Amino acid sequence: HFKPILVLCLATLALGLFVPHFAADRNSIVHLFEWKWSDIADECERFLAPKGFGGVQISPPNENLVVTSSNRPWWERYQPVSYILNTRSGDEAALADMISRCNAVGVRIYVDTVINHMTGMGGTGTAGSQADRDGKNYPAVPYGSGDFHDSCTVNNYQDASNVRNCELVGLADLNQGSDYVRSKIIEYMNHLVDLGVAGFRVDAAKHMWPADLEAIYASLKNLNTDHGFLDGQKPFIFQEVIDLGGEAISKHEYTGFGTVIEFQYGLSLGNAFQGGNQLANLANWGPEWNLLDGLDAVAFIDNHDNQRTGGSQILTYKNPKPYKMAIAFMLAHPYGTTRLMSSFAFDNNDQGPPQDDAGNLISPSINDDGTCGNGYVCEHRWRQIFNMVGFRNAVQGTGIENWWSDGNQQIAFGRGNKGFVAFTIGYDLNQHLQTGLPAGSYCDVISGNAENGSCSGKTITVGGDGYADISLGANEDDGVIAIHVNAKL
């Protein structure tokens, strides 16, 4: 008797929550960390859409605490004062304009949603509202002391109640079990759905009860069809649940009603591409590595938190050769919905985004070679990264075939008859390998771009039998080559 109901439920879930609603032939969410809304709109039109990117994760769009003590650090955006859409990135009109412009060119917007807590101190917000941290009073919502959990400190990760009912680093902890609190969160998220967003990154999901989140998500509206979404689709949900094992809370508690950001992914790949594990061992990359099922996961190499505090295993723009290799592997491998980091340069962990003397955000400048200036790293504009987004689009719908390794630090694999990649760490690769590709000449999209039938990088020739001679020197700028059918010369 239960089967038809189960099938119906699964079909309903498949219309959203677990799928990112990318337009056709697009992939990957890029986190344009601390960018202004007007700059994101420009970037959607001039770069992200033409290069095949799926969407943008934006910084929290709601009013946050102005923190002058540390010269406006990045983390002030994670201290909500209200759900008024007004931040240093722009006001509601600028946000709505960006969402419309990005959707118009097929690039989706995902909101970083901070609903676990309010501020960690008192003061004034970016829209001028007041935050009374000691009295737990936020009149612009309004929230009062009765809307929060009792004050205690998150200090025992072996105790799920401590993690979920106490205060994370002193941040006033909302009680999502309250119907009123839920109603304010739902109202905020549905306002964003009305504006045309495609989904939500849920900050600090591990610090909220799964049943409360499930109830909140169940009350979200369908995506706005005026923005090109199909009828009856729910927002894509990707939840921040840091689970590296050994704690009371498991990432699996959150997979029934949304995807989960898989922190083990970048940790293990960061270790492997720095030589801490043999690349050959990546042959069974996936759940056997204690990863979630790919359909439940958002995969990433680094994010705005762990590029600062994640330790030496986390690869970032500061270690570019293995970083680009790990990203190439992520984008070449079918696992998960992939997310890319786009940073501003920083020297200390609290440092805020590029800003003028008045605290206004400075826009990234675009250099003649397509890279960014004004203090922005723009990893998404690195050739080796955006060309692998193109690779992922070209190989969509195929599996891994023709896996090869030397048993150590050299690997290669194909994606059906659409694409092929090879990697080496530490010593030269010279092999005659089966690519699975049709005969012809291909542009290696890591070393160059394929444009108008010519290639600015290496050319790789595939014979009628699908084999090619693959050479990759240990001391080259990049320890990876990638060819695909859309880069055939």
Curated annotation (Swiss-Prot):
Chloride binds at residues 201, 303, 339. GO terms for molecular function: alpha-amylase activity; metal ion binding. Ca(2+) binds at residues 116, 164, 173, 207. The active site is at residues 203, 240. The keyword Metal-binding applies. Residues 1-16 form the signal peptide. Its cofactor is Ca(2+); chloride. It comes from the Eukaryota. Disulfide bonds join 44-102, 152-166, 372-378, 443-455. One of its GO terms (biological process) is carbohydrate metabolic process. Keywords: Calcium, Carbohydrate metabolism, Chloride, Disulfide bond, Glycosidase, Hydrolase, Metal-binding, Signal. The record marks 305 as: Transition state stabilizer. Pfam families: Alpha-amylase, Alpha-amylase_C. Binds 1 Ca(2+) ion per subunit. Binds 1 Cl(-) ion per subunit. Its EC number is 3.2.1.1. It catalyses: Endohydrolysis of (1->4)-alpha-D-glucosidic linkages in polysaccharides containing three or more (1->4)-alpha-linked D-glucose units. Belongs to the glycosyl hydrolase 13 family. Monomer. This is Alpha-amylase. It comes from Tribolium castaneum (Red flour beetle).
